[in-house]
C-alpha cells in the first residue's frame, strides 16, 4: 500500500515504464524508454481522502525505487518521499507499507501468507 498525493485516476491500471539510473546520480532512478530495464506495476485505488489516495500495488518486476518512480511518473508521487517528492508535511518517511505478502515456503512449498495493519502514521492520513 502507498499513500500518494492527489486523487488517483484512473482508479486501476498497469504501468509499463522502463527504469534506469538517473544520469549523474548513483541513487536516483528515472523512467527511460530508450535504455531502461523493463518495469511493470499494477495498481488499484483503495480510498481517496483529503487530497490523497491510498493505492494497492503489485509488482511484476522488482526494480530499485520502482513504486516510487512509477507513481511519480503517473503524476501521483508518494507523500513523504524525500528523494522524489520532498514534502514532509504529513509524514516523515515514505508512505509505503507492505500490507499483504504471499510466497511458497522454501522447504515445504506450502503457501505462506502474511498481513500487517496500516501503521498509525499512515492511518492518520487515510484510514482503511
Give, region by region, the residue ranges found by the protein language model.
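RNA pseudouridine synthases
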Residues: 1-128
